[in-house]
Regions:
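Bulky hydrophobic/aromatic packing residues
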Residues: 11-12, 16-17, 60, 114, ...
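An amphipathic alpha-helical core segment
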Residues: 131-219, 223
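An N-terminal structural lobe/cap that precedes and organizes the functional/catalytic core
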Residues: 1-105, 199-229
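Active-site-proximal alpha-helical scaffolds that flank and shape metal-associated catalytic sites
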Residues: 78-81, 87-159
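Short, hydrophobic/amphipathic alpha-helical patches that form generic packing surfaces
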Residues: 19-29, 105-121, 180-184
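Long, hydrophobic, amphipathic alpha-helical segments used as structural scaffolds
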Residues: 77, 119-126, 130, 168, ...
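Hydrophobic/aromatic-lined pockets within catalytic cores
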Residues: 65, 69-70, 74, 78-79, ...
Length: 229
């Protein structure tokens, strides 16, 4: 749910904070062995009055910490729980039928992807801002990784550049691509992904059903982005 983090916690005139709102996730995805970093420590040592005071990096590490806090809140939120309960029995039935593994994990991931899809469909211009912000903060990421002692910086930055250049999230306007994204996540975490069949009618019906409930619940709990000033 990269875009959701950016959308919900966006801060005007704080580009390093905004770019860092996805940092914990992309660190885990791009460099798994270098993802368990103590963001709170680096937030403290870059704060005002400290020997390594740096307002841009301090904003960056605050963005990392906000991501972690938002994840904790989201998983306990009424929004997530209501979508989960609406789709739980459907996914319990369909996962074995479609040979999709790990029902609970998979539904959790799909809900997050579908929320991104909903926000993209309704705020497409903000997705372009998301990618523009990431591109503008390449050097901030590199400097932050150097401070944290990350030992795969070039590899991370190569993946980071590819991420904002390819702009894959625009494909989330097509629910078929949501299924493809889920299949790639299963590959990444070493789960069986052979279940995925492009344009499969039963799979697409499951994505559509889930998206409909996401739309229903988000109408009840609307997410808003702070005005860009």
């Amino acid at each position: 749910n990269f875009f959701s983090h950016f959308f919900v916690d966006f801060q005007p005139k704080k580009p390093s904070f905004n770019a860092a709102l996805i940092a914990p996730d992309i660190l885990r995805n791009f460099t798994p062995s270098q993802s368990k970093l103590h963001f709170d420590h680096f937030q403290q040592i870059t704060s005002k009055g400290q020997p390594q005071e740096d307002p841009i990096l301090n904003d960056f590490f605050n963005g990392c910490l906000q991501h972690i806090q938002r994840d904790k809140e989201f998983h306990q939120s009424a929004l997530f729980q209501e979508i989960y309960q609406l789709q739980r029995s459907n996914w319990q039935l369909m996962c074995p039928k479609l040979k999709i593994p790990r029902f609970w994990f998979t539904l959790h991931v799909v809900i997050e992807i579908m929320i991104d899809s909903y926000l993209i469909n309704n705020h497409l211009e903000k997705l372009q801002l998301f990618y523009t912000t990431l591109e503008s903060q390449q050097e901030t990421y590199r400097t932050a990784l150097e401070l944290m002692g990350h030992d795969q910086i070039d590899h991370f930055m190569e993946r980071y550049t590819r991420f904002y250049t390819n702009q894959y999230l625009f494909h989330y306007q097509d629910l078929e691509r949501v299924g493809f994204a889920l299949h790639k996540i299963h590959e990444q975490v070493k789960l069986d992904s052979s279940w995925y069949i492009p344009n499969n009618i039963e799979q697409l019906a499951l994505w559509k059903s889930t998206y409909a409930d996401v739309c229903l619940v988000l109408a009840k709990y609307p997410l808003e982005m702070k005005p860009i000033r």
